[in-house]
Every structure is written in C-alpha cells, then in structure tokens.
Design a protein with these regions (language model features):
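Active-site glycine-rich loops that stabilize anionic/oxyanionic intermediates
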Residues: 77-82, 86-89
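Conserved acidic catalytic loop of the alpha/beta-hydrolase fold
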Residues: 149, 173-195
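Gly/Ala-rich beta-loop-alpha elbow adjacent to hydrolase catalytic centers
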Residues: 197-206
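Short beta-strand element of the alpha/beta-hydrolase
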Residues: 70-78
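Conserved alpha/beta-hydrolase
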Residues: 93-119
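N-terminal cap/lid segment of alpha/beta-hydrolase-fold proteins
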Residues: 10-68
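Catalytic active-site module of serine/aspartate enzymes centered on a nucleophile-bearing elbow/loop
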Residues: 320, 324-349
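The feature captures the conserved acid-bearing segment of alpha/beta-hydrolase catalytic domains
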Residues: 224-304, 309-311
Length: 349
C-alpha cells in the first residue's frame, strides 16, 4: 500500500514520492508470566487469587517495503524514550523510520519492556511527576538552558521544543538490562538476521543483545554512555567527570562473551559540543567521559581482532549535533553516513 507522509510543520514539508509499504504490523515479544497463588472464582473476579499477569515484554511495530534488503534494521531507544525517537522529528520531518524505509530496509521499532506501549511490568514502581525538562535540555546538549548552543542542529522554535519534551516517557518498572536484552534477542529469533541500531542507554543493552544472539549481524550505536563491557582483567580505570552522574566505569564480563562482539562490525557516532579536556561545564564533561570510554572500548574490541569504529562527527566536519543525532536538522546527512557504512560492510544487499 502507498502511504502519503504529511509533516506536522508546513515549513519543513517537502514533496516526496509516496511511501510504499508491502506489509506492516505489530506484536509483543519476550516477557514473562506469573500466576497468583490461590484459586480464581468468577464471583470474586476482582481478587488476584489464581489469576495471571503477563508483562516485561517488548512491543514491536514493523514496516517492510517491497524487495527489501536482506537485513532489516531493528531500532532500540534510550532512557526516558520510546520508539518515538526514530519516528517523526520534533519539527515534523521524517525520522530514521521513514528515511530507511524509503531506502529499501525493513524497519522494526521497539518499545523496550516497561516503557511506552510495552508498559506492563511484573515489578512495581512509583512514577513521580517531577519537573526536570530543563535538565534534559542541558543534558542532551541542546544548549545550557535557556540558551541554545550557537551551532546546534536542533530547531529553535517553541513548538519543536514542546514536541521534544512531550516525547519523553517514564519507566513503569525498573530498567533491567537482562529483561530488555532477552526481549530484543527473542525478536531476532523471530525475524532472523538483522542490524541493531541503538541510542544512549539502549547501546549498553545492544552490546549484551549482540553477545546473546548471533543473528545480530552488526551494531550501529548513537551516543552510548554507560554499559561498556570489557573482558576480565582489562577493565580501564573509571573516568572522572563533573557530569551530574559522576565518574564513568566500565563493566567486566568473561572473555568468551566479549569475543562475541569481535565477530560483527560496530560503529559508534557522537555529536558536537563535547569537551576535549576536563571542564566544569558539566553536560559537556559528562559526554567527554562517554566518548573517552567508547574509544577505550573500541580499542579493546579491535585488540581482540574485532571491527569497531568511533566517529566523532565534528572531526569529519559535521557540527552542531545534539544527543539526538538521528532527529537533528541534518538527520538525512547522518543517515547517509550510516548507509555508507552499511554498504562498506556489505550489509545493504
């Protein structure tokens, strides 16, 4: 079927050919189920006794174009986010979902367990209505609130910022990397081989998924911070930072698990306004420690015979990107770089 795309912002509306989709759908994958002790009685149906609870699954929305490339793209979001990360941008342009669908890739968008449309948890949590959006504006390097960075690739109009704030969504249960990776791994079991695209907190879960499942043929990671895994005995010293989350440490895992990451190509991208040296500007220093750890991690991967590359976009002449590289004003250019990398690695057949 052909689907016309209407941008919500007329200023960014562009004339494109209709989006052609052969099939689309959605489903849940992974998760657990438990049964409350006791016996269920219809007369007392509001009591939990003897009843079941299904939860901790991921929610998947997928679209497949005609004559799709061999390997579909699986998109995993980061903290405080959902599959919306990869959909329409805050100012109404097409996101990676549509950009790569137009380029012939099947796309699978996840809401990880206990988030978004997968918001059915088997563990309890308290969700507080906390005013924190100016923190996130600063943490995600849009600027130092209320000021935008001068070269920022984020739209500076009020409506776009409101859309950005409204795409954030809470956990309904504690983040659990094992729960997340079990669900993502089961998705690959269901759909077969593919390429995992991750963002931020989702990148750590991405490494673990790639370890669990050899159907993950490659990993593209946008701005990972935590969750870098190193073989036992090779853990680097923590990297100190003035960032609000303190020093950044890696995670030690068995060598046999780490070596599974050396069997598939990996590329990591970081945006702009990241400090080169330690600084008191906490958001820039926070991401300095993440970038430094990523480089140590890639060095460890390559030392063991792997293929990991870290790309700091300003070093190749691309400036102004925020933490949300995939939805910035230059996201088509960013997609081009990812597409070129996939072609270079023989993954766009």
């Amino acid at each position: 079927m052909a689907v016309g795309v209407n941008a919500q912002n007329k200023k960014t509306k562009s004339k494109q050919k209709p989006l052609v989709i052969e099939t689309q759908g959605s489903f849940a994958v992974g998760g657990t189920m438990f049964t409350q002790p006791g016996n269920f009685e219809v007369a007392n149906a509001l009591k939990p006794d003897g009843q079941t609870l299904h939860g901790d699954h991921a929610y998947i929305f997928y679209q497949l174009p005609p004559k799709a490339h061999k390997y579909p793209l699986v998109f995993l979001h980061g903290a405080g986010q959902s599959k919306k990360t990869w959909e329409t941008t805050p100012d109404g342009r097409e996101g990676f979902q549509n950009i790569f669908l137009r380029r012939g890739f099947g796309v699978y968008l996840l809401d990880q367990p206990r988030r978004g449309e997968a918001g059915k948890s088997t563990v309890e949590a308290t969700i507080k209505a906390t005013a924190d959006e100016q923190f996130w504006f600063t943490q995600f390097r849009i600027g130092n609130y209320p000021d935008y960075f001068p070269n920022v690739q984020f739209p500076k109009d009020k409506a776009s910022l409101e859309q950005f704030y409204r795409q954030m969504t809470p956990n309904v249960g504690a983040f659990d990397a094992n729960v997340v990776t079990d669900a993502v791994s089961q998705l690959f079991d269901k759909i077969g081989e593919g390429i995992l695209i991750t963002h931020s907190q989702g990148c750590g879960a991405g490494w673990l998924t790639a370890i669990k499942n050899d159907k993950v043929k490659a990993v593209v990671a946008y701005e990972p911070y935590s969750g870098f895994v190193f073989p036992k005995g090779e853990l680097p010293q923590p990297i100190n930072s003035t960032g609000l989350f303190g020093a950044l440490s890696g995670v030690e895992i068995p060598l046999a698990d780490f070596e599974k990451l050396t069997k598939k190509p990996i590329v990591i991208y970081y945006g702009d306004n990241i400090a080169k040296e330690p600084t008191s500007v906490w958001n820039k220093d926070h991401w300095r420690s993440g970038l430094e750890m990523a480089r140590l991690w890639a060095t460890a991967i390559n030392k063991h015979g792997g293929d990991a590359t870290v790309v700091h976009l300003p070093e190749i002449g691309i400036n102004g990107n925020t933490h949300f590289i995939m939805s910035d004003l230059n996201n088509v250019q960013i997609a081009d770089y990812m597409a070129d990398w996939l072609k270079e690695k023989g993954l766009d057949k």
